[in-house]
Structure formats: structure tokens, C-alpha cells
Amino acid sequence: GPVDFLNRRTLLHDLRELVQPLNVSTRQVRAAMAAAEEAQRAFYAGLQAMGAEFLSSLDRWDRVAVLVGRPYNTCDPGVSMALPYKLRALGVVPLPMDCLPLEEIDVSDRFDNMYWRSGQAILAAGRFIAREPRLQAIYVTNFGCGPDSFLLSFFRRIMSSTDGSPKVYLELELDDHTADAGVNTRCEAFFDSLAAQGTWARA
């Protein structure tokens, strides 16, 4: 059957069911879970360290765009239509939002009922980007995505800088029918508009 990650108890039960034909003990399953959790924690800690080092080296006019969205949208080259490579070709550094210190950013003052962990991370990324003049945001979504239908409006509201002025961002809705040329054109137009406002270095 399916493996439910709702909580540790449910996960342990489902994993035991899954490996039952392999004659694996409960103790071995617990040990495997602990090892997996530690590997995941170390992976995210590495991303955070890499992000902190990168941000500390940034110049005011470095061209950096944070890819905002769920990992299966932003990190998969097929789903994202190789967006990071397109940005590099335009002279822009793509930065995964997981490299930002999201755990340190509290959004409960405006969205205390956002129980969805991925939604919390996306809004935390928005708040960080809004207050960081060296970063721009590209929100990657899909056609007909239910959660994004309301999350995008929250993201738009939280994308305001410390002085209250809104910070623009690019929203890319990608699916199998999206043309490569269209993605390139929208990115170029976004970066050109930022340069015209004087908030972005020209290529």
C-alpha cells in the first residue's frame, strides 16, 4: 500500500508493511528511518551553508533570481523546462529557495493559519526576497494548481519591502504546452523592466 508521511507513527507502520516480505525487523526499520532523517537534515544544512556563503559574497548589482515554488516544479529540469539553464544563458544566477534561511523567517504575523509546510516555506522565501534588494523572485507554478490558486495571492501580499512598497516578481505557469521561446521572452522582459527601474544591472 501507500506510504504516509503524516507522522512518525504512521510512517513506521506503513514502512513495516512495505518491507514485511523482506523479513526486516521493526528495529531495522527504525534505524533506517533515523538514518534517512539524518541524511535529509544534513542535506538541508548543507544547502543553508551554501546559501549563506553565496549571499555573503553578493554585490549589489549581481543578477540573482530565486526560484520559488515546490521542489518538483523548480528543481526538476523537465517540469521547469530547464529554467535554471535558461537563466544562466541570460547571465542570471538561479538560486533555489531552499538555500535561503527559511527556518529563521516567521510569517505567522500575517498568515498564522498557514498549516501547509510548503506554503510556509514559500511565504518565508517571499518575505526574505522582498527585504533583500540583491534578490529577485521567479514563482514557478502549473496550470490549474489548486494550492497555488490561493497561495499566489498570499505571496503577492507578502512581497512588500520594509518600507511597504511592493516588489515585483515574475510568475511562470509551466506545462507541456509552454513554448521554450515564450519562457525566454518572459524572463528577458522581466529583467529588462527591472533594469529600466534601476533595480537591476543590465546584461
Model regions and ranges:
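An N-terminal assembly and electron-transfer interface module characteristic of large anaerobic redox
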Residues: 1-203
